[in-house]
Amino acid sequence: VTAAGNGRAKVHDITQHSLEAVRKIKEAFNEIWHHELIAESRARIAAFARDAVQRVKDGTPPLSPVLLYEELVALFKDRVWRRSMALFLMGAMCGGCAGVALGLRLGARAAAGPHARALHTHHDQTVVLVEDAVTPAAGAGEVLIRVQAFSACCADRAALRGRGSALRALLGRPAVTVGRGFAGVVLDVGLGADALELGDEVWGCAAEWAPGAAAELLTVRSTLVSKRPRALAADAAASLPWAGAAALAALQRLQYDPENCKGKRVAVCGAGSGEGCVLVQLLSLWGASVAVLAPRHAALTLQDLGATEFVDVEGGHVSSWEPLEQHASRRGPWDAVLACSGAGTPPTPVENTAALLKSTAPRNAVVDLRPSPLLSDRLPAPLSLLFAASFYSFRVLRWMVGCGWHTDWLWSHASRAPGLETLARLVDEGHLRPVLDKVYLPQEFETALAHACSDEAIGTTVVRFP
């Protein structure tokens, strides 16, 4: 009996609460409905409807352009109506943008996949190895890759310091930000990723605004990876994609190719870096005379890669471009100058280009490959909101015209599948070989990053999952 009484009491309470909620909703609706502005709007609509009906009866078209124009002019002369419409439009715009942003965030969440080890970053730039990180499942056009090794370079330090953070926030990326180039094996293929199959050995790049490759399981779009050369092990393969893509992008900016590069004089500063080693090999392969600016302990390696001139950097630290300018005054200026992130590159941009370049060199003959803050990272708060709205609007426009919802257009052509296939072909033909420096374990990532950014590094530093 007590239980039955308690049940009836609970039902009665629920009924009373429901009736009270309905009553409050009715009161709120009546208050809004009888508000002065709403009542005035209803009166205007009713008057316009009566006038339209009367005009139909009289045989006059109710939707005459002249009549509509007169009505709009009369409305816009009403200050209260203008203020009400402005508030309505602002509320609709803010609410619509918030709804679209929330929908995009919720729609970007992929289904949870398996757990694996990954390096997660924190706001204080520390990197922690997580043993059970959740990996998103492979969606349409994506592949799930078991990462065997990934590279550590100066771009990782730039990402830890905030490079690409605005784009990462807009894309809803997870916390993993380190690991740029990677090599692994395909474990799962999503719908539409027909170019790859299970078990394919692949390599690829992860930009600073992407999740990063420092995870044992990685989900990426199939257009951002390609099959790696079979002759390369995972360690050597992971050292080449990011550095090779950066080198190809720099040569594309200079519009250099095997047909027009022969006989040109090119200076590569910081040639001991991963991208510097690739540039030296490609330029020497295409017939250019390559001068390198690097520490003395890297001289033999760079000469073996094809360098013809060596500018010694004592101690690896250079505060200005004076050593290179002095060498140019003795041996002659260059057709192009490439500044890499390795030891020997001055921290400041080139100012006296006339002392380094030939008079016939184009204006863009100085290419800086070092990571610098993106424009989206430097915008103040009002402009960052405008950038976010423009970014989402552009994505929606691309989706409406049938270009898809992906963000492949953010990547350079050299870091996507066509550029990676070009690197693989050069390796298979024996024209390009990776320069592997040291190999570390995931728990030693901070040591690996410190070595990769030091003056002692020659080539690319790699971290391998055991």
Task: Locate the predicted segments by residue.
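C-terminal hydrophobic helical "lid"/dimerization subdomain
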Residues: G7-L19, I25, N30-I38, R42, ...
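Glycine-rich beta-strand-centered segment in the early N-terminal region that forms part
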Residues: F29, F76-W81, A138-S151, S165-W209
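Short hydrophobic alpha-helical membrane-entry/anchor segments
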Residues: C97-A111
